[in-house]
C-alpha cells in the first residue's frame, strides 16, 4: 500500500513538473501570399473597414424605411373622481369611467427628400467600399515591405555570419603561421580585430530582426509566441517582379482619386437633398378611434314622460333624447320628469330608470394630406450655396491631387529603374569582390600577400554582398509603392480581392 502511494505521488510530481514547463512555441511557415491572406482576413483595420460597409448598409435601409407605412396605436383610461357640474343646481354630466383607444396610419405617397437621401446613401456605400479598398491597398503595401525587410535582415545576417566564418578562418590560419613563426604578432592581432569588429554589427542586425519580426506579427495579428519561418528569397521575388514588369502612368484606379470622385457625387446628391426641401410632400392617412364611458342612460319609457305621453314614440327622437340625457344627467332628468308631471297634473311617475352599461363610439377617418413649403427664410438657399462652393473646392482639390499623383507615379517608375540599375551593378560588384578575395586569400596563403590586403578584400566582399541585398530590397519596395500608387489590387487564388 505504501509503495502504491509513493508511485502515485511520483506520477503526480512528474505531471506537475511537465505542466510547469513552458510549452514549445508554435511555428508558422509563411509565404508572401499566405502572409497577405492572413493580414487581409485578420487585421483589425480591415475588419473596421468591413464593419463600416455594414453600417452604411443599415443607414441605407433606415432611409428606405421612411417610404414604408407607419402605424401607431394609443390608449387611455380615466376615472372621474369628481364630475364637472353644469350649474349651481348640482347637475353633473359625464361617466365615471372612460376608455379611449386609437390607431393612426400614415402612408408616404410622394417624398422627394427621401428619394434624394436614398441616392446619397448609395453613394455613401460606394465611399465606404472605396475606403475599405484603400485600407487593403495600404495593408498589402505594408505587409510586403515588412516581409521583404525581414528577409533583408535575415539574409544580411547570413552574409555577416559568412564573413565571420571567413574572418575566423583567417585568424586560425594566421595563428598557425604565428606559431610556426611565419607571421608576426601584428598580423595575428589584425586578424583578430577584423573578427571582433563584426560582432557589434551582428548584434545590431539580430536586434533589428527581432523588431521586424514583431512588426510583421502585429500586421498579421498573430500571437507573439508564434515563430515565423519565411519562405522565399529576395532574389526570387526580384526575378518574379522582373518577369512581370510593366509600368504605366495610368492613375485612374488610384484610391485617392476614386475617393475624390465619390465625394463629388456625394456632394451633388447632397445638393439634391437640399433642393428637395422646396418640393411638396404628399401622404395618405387613416385614423380609427374607439371611445367608451359608463354615463347613465335615461329610459323615458319607465319615467314620467312615458306614461305621460303614451301615444308618443320617443325612439323617433334619439338625438334629442341623447342630448337632453347627456346635458342634464340622471338627477336632472328625474327633476325634469317630476316638474313636467306636476305641470301636467301629476301624470306619470316623477322618477326615471337609468342604465349603467358602457356606451361605445368608433369613428373612422381616411384622407390625403399635402405639405407645400412656401417660405422658410433663406435657410434652403444658403445651404444650397454652401454645397455648391464645396463642390467647387473639391474639383480644385481633385485637379491638384491628379497632378501630384502624376508626379508620384513618374517618380516611382524612376525609382524602380534606379533600383534595377543599382541591383545589376551590385551583382557585378559581388562577383568582382568575390574574385578579388579568392586571389588575395590565395596570395596570403602562399605567403605573398599581407593580412591587410586580405582584410581589405574580405571587407569589400562583405560590403558588396550587403549592398546587393539592400539593392534588391529597394527594388522590391519600390515595386510595392508603385502598385499602391496606381491602385493595383491584390488577388487571392485568382479572385480579385477588391472590386
PLM segments and residue spans:
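Acidic, low-complexity, intrinsically disordered peripheral segments
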Residues: 6-7, 20-25, 81, 299-304, ...
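Bacterial Sec-pathway N-terminal export signals of envelope proteins
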Residues: 19-76, 224, 231-270, 279, ...
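Short flexible linkers and secondary-structure junctions
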Residues: 20-145, 149, 205, 282, ...
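Sec/SRP-type N-terminal targeting helices
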Residues: 47-51, 64-65, 109-136, 186, ...
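Amphipathic alpha-helical coiled-coil segments
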Residues: 49-63, 135, 139-158, 176, ...
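Residues on the lipid-exposed face of transmembrane beta-strands in outer-membrane beta-barrel proteins
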Residues: 77, 103-109, 216, 368-372, ...
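Transmembrane beta-strands of outer-membrane beta-barrel pores
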Residues: 77-81, 109, 288-292, 372-374, ...
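Periplasmic alpha-helical coiled-coil/stalk elements that build and connect Gram-negative outer-membrane
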Residues: 138-255, 263-265, 274, 415, ...
